Curated annotation (Swiss-Prot):
Signal peptide: none
Gene: dhaG
Record flagged with keyword Ribosomal protein: no
GO molecular function: metal ion binding
Name by which UniProt lists this protein: Probable glycerol dehydratase-reactivating factor small subunit
Length: 117
C-alpha cells in the first residue's frame, strides 16, 4: 500500500526538466482539481512505457509519459501494456498539451475527454 498522496504521475525524460511543456501538462491537471506529481525518469525512451510506469505507481492508476523526442502518452494501469488512451506530441502546441493534462484529470474524475484540436 502506498502512503503517497493521491495524484496523477507524470514520468518524463530529463530533457524536459523545467520546461513549459511540463508546466502545461501539470496546469491541465490542476484545472481539473487533480494533483500532478512530475518525476524525472530516463529508464525508458518510449512515452507509453513511461506512462505505464507512471500509472502503475499512482494511487489513482492514471499516468502520463513524456519521452525525449516529445511523444506524450496518457494511460491507465488497467489497460494492456501496448495501449494508450490518448497520444500526443509537444509539437502540437501549448493548448493541446494542456488539454492532454486536463484529459488525465478528467479520466480520474470519470468525465468525458476534452477534444484535442
Amino acid at each position: 500500500m502506498s502512503l503517497s498522496s493521491p495524484g496523477v504521475h507524470l514520468f518524463y525524460h530529463s530533457r524536459w526538466q523545467g520546461t513549459r511543456v511540463l508546466d502545461e501538462l501539470c496546469w491541465g491537471l490542476e484545472e481539473q482539481g487533480v494533483p500532478c506529481r512530475a518525476i524525472c525518469c530516463d529508464d525508458h525512451d518510449c512515452a507509453l512505457a513511461l506512462g505505464k510506469l507512471a500509472a502503475k505507481s499512482s494511487t489513482l492508476r492514471v499516468g502520463l509519459g513524456l519521452n525525449a523526442t516529445g511523444d506524450i502518452a496518457l494511460t491507465h494501469a488497467q489497460l494492456p501494456e501496448d495501449r494508450a488512451l490518448v497520444c500526443g506530441h509537444t509539437r502540437a502546441g501549448t493548448a493541446q498539451i494542456r488539454t492532454l493534462g486536463a484529459n488525465a484529470g478528467q479520466l480520474v474524475k470519470v468525465l468525458p475527454f476534452s477534444e484535442i484540436k
